[in-house]
Amino acid sequence: MSKDEEAAPQSEEQVLLRVEALREAARIITGDRDVQYGGPEDNLTRIAKIWSVLFEREITAEEVAMAMVGVKLARFVSKSGFQSDTWIDIAGYAGCGYEVGKLATGE
């Protein structure tokens, strides 16, 4: 199998499922969540400040997003079967972590 064949999606259905998951994550992280909790930078920074006190070291907003992905991964261990909401949450935290990391580094 060539490199191109390995990288190519198996079917249109698979591509659509991937896009569906990412669109749902995007809908959640760009929807009314900002109104409820503030934008990702504000919300994750607020959590980081609390965790910094608890863990007695500086925690960044990006580290909070990474830790939340870890929390979601731990949920997979505790339950069996397909967990669509957990996959969506992981994608959402990845998007937020990307945003705050990029803003923090100026890249």
Identify what each model region corresponds to.
Residues 2-107:
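Intrinsically disordered, low-complexity regulatory regions
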